[in-house]
């Protein structure tokens, strides 16, 4: 079996050693070299031609972002960022994903060694996903490069969009939200992310989009023109009802499909609370989280969309949904916003 060849770039010798130990403990991958900074890494990449690079976000001698930007321009390859759990770390990580990094893993703040060893399976999963990922170019940043804003059909506040994503999802979500007008239907999103990063992600999207994007809070009313992002790591997000209103419910619970928040938990709750007033959307991601939930939504009368293989970074979750017969339609990412708004224009049903 051909192993996934990995180079680890981190200024901490401790982290380099731990990453090597973790990666080499999995039979399908190996560390072929490590580097303390991007300048050393540049030579090692030429020498070893790795399948995946793990890259520390904040490093001396050359900033991780500068290096990533040059790498994606000159020699694109799958990169998994290793990030500290700080606000600055969160902002830098969001920018790294925009520049083309496939995914990221957090560095635990305390007891680095124990934390990283606990993360062994997660790190291995992310490296496997990265090795199979379809590379994207950097996201456009100039205002001129932003897509034309779509016009909203007449909406009822009963209609809402329920969306799930994982690997590659941050940029896919950005692409879906950017063209939406300010009077779009409410959107609830579960994107697999650790605690501490969803706030940075929501703030980043809020500055770019016409809709209001924020991290969801328990008990808040769901309003049109708003996007609610499930907080990372600690709780599941559900859609509930309070009288005639939809509300956000955040609740503790065991991980589902190894994820918390889980897309399936959100989708199953939407099937129950919104029925045919919901539009279910499943975007790029590894694994099967969301597939069964999308089927439940479809059976409850929702219209369901899955991202097509050609536009996915990792065609895992949408593929599982399609195999289950859970998707009414398979849609390329660039057409997704328009399809959502077209379906949202259908009349809402009072529940």
Curated annotation (Swiss-Prot):
The modification 4-aspartylphosphate is found at residue 56. It catalyses: [protein]-L-glutamate 5-O-methyl ester + H2O = L-glutamyl-[protein] + methanol + H(+); L-glutaminyl-[protein] + H2O = L-glutamyl-[protein] + NH4(+). SMART domains: REC. Pfam families: CheB_methylest (PF01339), Response_reg (PF00072). The active site is at 166, 192, 289. GO terms for cellular component: cytoplasm. Signal peptide: none annotated. Its EC number is 3.1.1.61, 3.5.1.44. CDD domains: CheB_Rec, REC_CheB-like. Its main location: cytoplasm. HAMAP family: CheB_chemtxs. Belongs to the CheB family. Contains a C-terminal catalytic domain, and an N-terminal region which modulates catalytic activity. PANTHER family: PROTEIN-GLUTAMATE METHYLESTERASE/PROTEIN-GLUTAMINE GLUTAMINASE, PROTEIN-GLUTAMATE METHYLESTERASE_PROTEIN-GLUTAMINE GLUTAMINASE. This is Protein-glutamate methylesterase/protein-glutamine glutaminase 2.
